[in-house]
Amino acid sequence: MEAKLFVLFCTFTVLKADTICVGYHANNSTDTVDTVLEKNVTVTHSVNLLEDSHNGKLCSLNGIAPLQLGKCNVAGWLLGNPECDLLLTANSWSYIIETSNSENGTCYPGEFIDYEELREQLSSVSSFEKFEIFPKASSWPNHETTKGVTAACSYSGASSFYRNLLWITKKGTSYPKLSKSYTNNKGKEVLVLWGVHHPPTTSEQQSLYQNADAYVSVGSSKYNRRFTPEIAARPKVRGQAGRMNYYWTLLDQGDTITFEATGNLIAPWYAFALNKGSDSGIITSDAPVHNCDTRCQTPHGALNSSLPFQNVHPITIGECPKYVKSTKLRMATGLRNVPSIQSRGLFGAIAGFIEGGWTGMIDGWYGYHHQNEQGSGYAADQKSTQNAIDGITNKVNSVIEKMNTQFTAVGKEFNNLERRIEKLNKKVDDGFLDVWTYNAELLVLLENERTLDFHDSNVRNLYEKVKSQLRNNAKELGNGCFEFYHKCDDECMESVKNGTYDYPKYSEESKLNREEIDGVKLESMGVYQILAIYSTVASSLVLLVSLGAISFWMCSNGSLQCRICI
């Protein structure tokens, strides 16, 4: 009985022993990240690298408003379709917006030659100076400039024509050969547009131009073409059996362009001195234009984001994140948010020896929990926490900086004859997009694995730091905690935390308590062994007595007969 009471007393004493535990921060975060080995790992802190939202608006770009073409397209705007008169004064923009029903382009039917290339050129233009290249009143004294109108380009119910071109016809009964030149002195490239008319019949050719064998010649240092009218019967489009083909060229500073014709010339009236050098572009969008500002615009809406990736739209204008196909790119910065023991990454650094994170420790990532006669409490290890924060912050910033190549990505332009090239280009673009997406996802997976293992190793290092100080002055409990063999007040606890624990000071007390506890263990083991033997012997005796009594009873009533044979 004395041994039993002594064992119970020692057990009670052990439960009240001073302890210190190494642990890590936990919170109520539900953020999840993916690693190379796992998916949806809950972590205490993380940063999102993928922008997936927009405001649904078309905004000004860095304070400069876009040019909304409305129901007009680029051709109608530059040629001066009468339906696009609201755009006549437009001369600057951050980007150009066409809508899905931008149908007002060339009002007189015909082909706009190299139209897609012209749209591509506008991607680097943000403003222009519109000017009269050949003034209407003085440039064509021997020709008619007022009768060239058509019902196909009507305005307010009356026949009209393009605002930036002149349809030159015969004056009286003659169309003398014309020759007109312009030398570019604007200090920048000048966009010049003109056209060539192809009548449906020879009678219309003579009615308009008098000359049956007319030609149009256009030449500069880089451009030289001669056009002859193609007179042929054609089905009517917009009420017209004739056709007009539209042409353009860029005239360098100091270069001269000369127009020579004996008929069929749709002469330039206005030209455009282009201001190049900034990223612009043409997008097709039905989103509304609002009084807002952004650094990145997509057809779906504006992105106000400094993240390195986005999955909103591949077409972007401005300083935009790189488009990827991913649906999630989240980088871990904190630790696993672990409520219970589970596997911990490649290193397995604290697998099975830390039961779970502490929500009570809010001022650091790693730290201590102690309990002694003076009370208990949490304390973060500021040095290891700060080193980890600095390292991870630098890593995240480096990843974002390397991957955050912001740029404009506008769609490439192809005409109907280049569909095979367009399909090939799309395949190439899709291939690059797949590579970008794969690289981004792999980078995040690897960095997340490294970050979580980095945290694990930091907790392990903190544990080893405590263990190396305490040595045999404390017992490892196997859950990240140490039980002291001596009294450890708050000053003692603080010395363990800051690495100044005085091992010799507590060695003698620890030795005595350790030997006493070990002795109790041995004595209690002997008591329990004696009890076990006694119990076994007593049970055997009871069994034998019972068997003997049953045998005697059965012999007395004849149920059991015993015969002894010699």
Curated annotation (Swiss-Prot):
One of its GO terms (cellular component) is membrane. Glycans are attached at residues 27-28, 40, 104, 304, 498. The gene is HA. InterPro entries: Capsid_hemagglutn, Hemagglutn_HA1_a/b_dom_sf, Hemagglutn_influenz_A, Hemagglutn_influenz_A/B. It is found in: Virion membrane; Host apical cell membrane. It is a single-pass type I membrane protein. The chain crosses the membrane at residues 530-550. Residues 551-566 are cytoplasmic. A lipid is attached at residues 555, 562, 565 (S-palmitoyl cysteine). Major glycoprotein, comprises over 80% of the envelope proteins present in virus particle. The extent of infection into host organism is determined by HA. Influenza viruses bud from the apical surface of polarized epithelial cells (e.g. bronchial epithelial cells) into lumen of lungs and are therefore usually pneumotropic. The reason is that HA is cleaved by tryptase clara which is restricted to lungs. However, HAs of H5 and H7 pantropic avian viruses subtypes can be cleaved by furin and subtilisin-type enzymes, allowing the virus to grow in other organs than lungs. Residues 18-529 are extracellular. The lineage of its organism: Viruses, Riboviria, Orthornavirae, Negarnaviricota, Polyploviricotina. Keywords: Clathrin- and caveolin-independent endocytosis of virus by host, Clathrin-mediated endocytosis of virus by host, Disulfide bond, Fusion of virus membrane with host endosomal membrane, Fusion of virus membrane with host membrane, Glycoprotein, Hemagglutinin, Host cell membrane, Host membrane, Host-virus interaction, Lipoprotein, Membrane, Palmitate, Signal, Transmembrane, Transmembrane helix, Viral attachment to host cell, Viral envelope protein, Viral penetration into host cytoplasm, Virion, Virus endocytosis by host, Virus entry into host cell. GO terms for molecular function: host cell surface receptor binding. Pfam families: Hemagglutinin. This is Hemagglutinin.
